[in-house]
């Protein structure tokens, strides 16, 4: 079981953050939502909102192998995986050594070519992403 869950809130779906808040009420872990801007979030004993200038550095300093980080940032995910931290995105994709190098390479090419990828989702797909997140989150949390 994981001791801390960090959320890179600047790129995370708010519905996922709300799910994690409810989940953490029944578990002994700590949810740390990190953002570079303040937003409305119910703070409880197990939930903390940290507003910092550099989200990645803040998480990097506190995360360990008993932590899970939720982020969409592939470059940050690779760095965390190299340190033994569990990482997934808010769509339910679990990052690991089998997929991160390809995703990192692809992101680096897109960045160098200044290619921005926009994703458009319909409501049904959003529901499937949410369900995939929950399923994969449970598998990581309780492993």
Swiss-Prot record:
Signal peptide limits: none
Superkingdom of the source species: Bacteria
One Pfam family here: DUF188
Family per record: Belongs to the UPF0178 family.
Protein name, per record: UPF0178 protein BB_0029
Protein source organism: Borreliella burgdorferi (strain ATCC 35210 / DSM 4680 / CIP 102532 / B31) (Borrelia burgdorferi)
């Amino acid at each position: 079981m994981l001791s801390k869950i960090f959320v890179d809130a600047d790129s995370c779906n708010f519905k996922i953050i709300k799910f994690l808040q409810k989940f953490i009420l029944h578990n002994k872990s700590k949810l740390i939502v990190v953002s570079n801007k303040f937003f409305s979030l119910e703070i409880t004993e197990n939930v903390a909102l940290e507003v910092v200038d550099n989200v990645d550095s803040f998480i990097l300093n506190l995360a360990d192998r008993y932590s899970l980080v939720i982020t969409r940032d592939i470059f940050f995910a690779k760095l965390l995986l190299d340190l033994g931290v569990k990482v997934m995105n808010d769509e339910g994709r679990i990052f690991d050594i089998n997929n991160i190098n390809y995703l990192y390479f692809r992101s680096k090419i897109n960045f160098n070519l200044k290619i921005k990828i926009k994703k458009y989702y319909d409501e049904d797909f959003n529901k499937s992403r949410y369900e995939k997140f929950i399923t994969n989150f449970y598998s990581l949390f309780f492993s």
